[in-house]
């Protein structure tokens, strides 16, 4: 993965190299579109440049689709401090300004343009070791273009669809059906191009055919569910049906080589070898974190990989900014919050999740494995953060949190266990969270398989891992609960409740939940902010966010603003 990072920096420079005119038309001094890419090494740099877009967005995670998917869902609030209006606005489907998502828009379209370049040029490169190698790389470009468009379409709905580097001028916003048709088409191309081989340890961080099959199911389920369709017509006139997607997800589940990790707790960083025996919850449990000492998670099918080379320069995105945002707010003594490390307090967990989970599955070990019950686990925790915490609750997310560890000599704690495990020379908690952010996990594949086939096989495999009894008959409610518990805080809940058309009911439960404001008991009352959760969801036609006003202005009015964002949507603060 370190190699991928270095290549990415080269790729960025090369992709945007300027082209000058010489009397001799042969360019001997620089690479540009007339002579790049040509070789296998060039092709590898181009692909690295597309993946690098994941890190670029990670540098500003508060604007990302992943953060939106967490904070806008019914299982979290916005949180953060009184000046972190962006976080609270996402939760409320409001806006702190006119360009709240512009950086994400710009960054993802840069990634799409790199993917367009790869799709157009990699077939002409020489030096591939095999046809499979060439097809694998082109397939990865199709996957990443689809993934980036999936995020943009889910977030904004009405977006320009640019699939060629030759596009000039302003491309109008596409009909959503056209955008989703292209997403599904790209994933189909990725499935057909990439060989039936699981990503090797040496290529960890790259996607494979099976990740494309999983992403196909995710995209198909959202499009057909949210828009109430049964199939989708592709740009070439062919159709992808539910049966087609079942065939792909069956192949993924049966032949991919990915598997469920036997103990659910081993998926999360608090089970690392430096922390587990000092944490009461994990002590003596014979746990082994799947990523200990750079090991590869056998359940992870697509993840953002990080490295210890993050810095305050252009490489800040090499550290896990999402973990930092979800960390414990307030610079509290690490001994009082152990093993959970410092951060900005985004996404406090709604008390309703703990209550619903306890009522539905009182014996489910995943609840305590996923959610920190602060009064029970952290009795020395201090409410209020820097006396500015908004929407604080008694619950934190364990899965994505920074994790600290005790120092072996003397008193004290490492801010993150990675500082010790990977021998950091300079320590900074803002740059040293480097555990993966998993975007597609094999458990999700099994649950999507059950949903598509309306059977209990995948559900029961997931339940068995957690020590729960099997269910005898498939039902939508059983499937929906299983996804909520198994995949909590993994960026899928928001699109799930939207595509199932239960968002209004789910979001309404957030009203009047117990929270704290600046350390004092409060209620989550939101009706003064656009009428509240349900009103805003309805006004925005199902939870779509605003097109950045600067992009509308730059388009000369070609782009039109999304419904529900015309006026009166400015969030100025909690109180």
Segments and roles (model prediction):
Residues 357-464:
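C-terminal substrate/ligand-recognition segments
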Residues 28-32, 92-96, 161-169:
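Short linear capping/connector segments at secondary-structure termini
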Residues 39-40, 44-62, 80-156, 168-181, ...:
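Conserved, well-structured interaction surfaces
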Residues 3-6, 13-41, 183, 217, ...:
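Bacterial Sec-dependent N-terminal signal peptides
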Residues 157-165, 193-202, 259-266, 472:
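Glycine- and aromatic-rich loop/turn segments at beta-sheet edges
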Residues 20-84, 188-189, 206, 210, ...:
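An aromatic- and glycine-enriched ligand-binding surface/loop that stacks and positions planar moieties
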Residues 18-20, 108-111, 222, 272-330, ...:
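Long, intrinsically disordered, low-complexity segments
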Residues 151-155, 160, 198, 219-231:
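Short coil/turn linking the two alpha-helices of tandem helical-hairpin repeats
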């Amino acid at each position: 993965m370190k190699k991928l990072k270095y290549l990415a920096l080269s790729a960025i420079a090369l992709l945007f190299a300027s082209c000058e005119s010489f009397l001799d038309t042969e360019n001997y001094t620089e690479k540009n579109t007339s002579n790049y890419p040509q070789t296998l090494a060039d092709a590898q740099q181009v692909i690295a440049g597309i993946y690098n877009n994941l890190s670029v967005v990670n540098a500003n995670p508060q604007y990302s689709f992943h953060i939106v998917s967490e904070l806008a869902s019914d299982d979290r609030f916005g949180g953060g401090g009184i000046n972190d209006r962006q976080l609270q606005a996402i939760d409320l489907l409001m806006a702190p300004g006119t360009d709240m998502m512009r950086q994400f828009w710009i960054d993802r379209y840069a990634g799409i343009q790199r993917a367009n370049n790869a799709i157009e040029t990699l077939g002409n490169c020489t030096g591939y070791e095999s046809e499979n190698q060439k097809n694998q790389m082109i397939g990865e470009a199709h996957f990443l273009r689809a993934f980036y468009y999936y995020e943009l379409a889910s977030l904004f709905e009405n977006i320009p669809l640019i699939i060629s580097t030759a596009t000039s001028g302003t491309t109008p916003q596409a009909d959503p059906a056209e955008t989703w048709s292209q997403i599904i088409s790209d994933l189909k191309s990725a499935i057909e191009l990439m060989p039936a081989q699981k990503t090797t340890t040496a290529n960890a961080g790259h996607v494979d055919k099976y990740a494309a099959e999983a992403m196909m199911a995710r995209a198909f389920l959202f499009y057909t569910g949210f828009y109430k369709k049964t199939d989708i017509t592709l740009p070439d006139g062919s159709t992808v049906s539910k049966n087609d997607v079942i065939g792909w997800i069956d192949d993924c589940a049966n032949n991919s080589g990915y598997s469920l990790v036997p103990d659910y707790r081993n998926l999360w960083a608090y089970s690392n070898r430096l922390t587990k025996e000092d944490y009461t919850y994990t002590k003596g449990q014979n746990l082994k974190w799947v990523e200990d000492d750079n090991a590869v998670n056998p359940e992870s099918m697509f993840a953002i990989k990080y490295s210890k080379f993050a810095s305050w320069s252009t490489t800040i995105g090499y550290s896990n900014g999402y973990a930092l945002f979800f960390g414990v707010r307030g610079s509290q003594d690490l001994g009082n919050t152990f093993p959970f490390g410092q951060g900005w307090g985004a996404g406090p967990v709604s008390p309703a999740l703990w209550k619903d989970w306890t009522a539905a599955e009182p014996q489910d070990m995943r609840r305590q494995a996923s959610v920190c019950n602060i009064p029970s686990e952290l009795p020395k925790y201090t409410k209020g953060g820097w006396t500015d915490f908004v929407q604080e609750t008694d619950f934190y997310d364990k899965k994505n949190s920074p994790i600290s560890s005790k120092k072996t000599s003397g008193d004290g704690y490492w801010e993150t266990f990675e500082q010790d495990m990977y021998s950091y020379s300079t320590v900074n908690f803002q740059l040293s969270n480097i555990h993966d952010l998993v975007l597609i996990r094999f458990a999700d594949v099994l649950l999507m398989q059950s949903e598509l086939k309306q059977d209990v096989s995948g559900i029961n495999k997931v339940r068995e891992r957690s020590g729960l009894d099997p269910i005898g008959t498939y039902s939508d409610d059983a499937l929906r609960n299983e996804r909520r518990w198994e995949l909590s805080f993994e960026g899928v809940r928001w699109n799930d409740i939207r595509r199932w058309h239960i968002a209004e009911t789910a979001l309404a439960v957030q009203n009047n939940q117990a929270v704290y404001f600046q350390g004092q008991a409060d209620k989550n009352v939101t009706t003064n902010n656009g009428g509240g959760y349900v009103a805003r969801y309805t006004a925005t036609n199902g939870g779509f966010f605003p097109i950045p006003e600067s992009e509308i202005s730059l388009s000369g009015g070609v782009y039109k603003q999304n419904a529900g964002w015309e006026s009166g949507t400015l969030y100025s603060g909690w109180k």
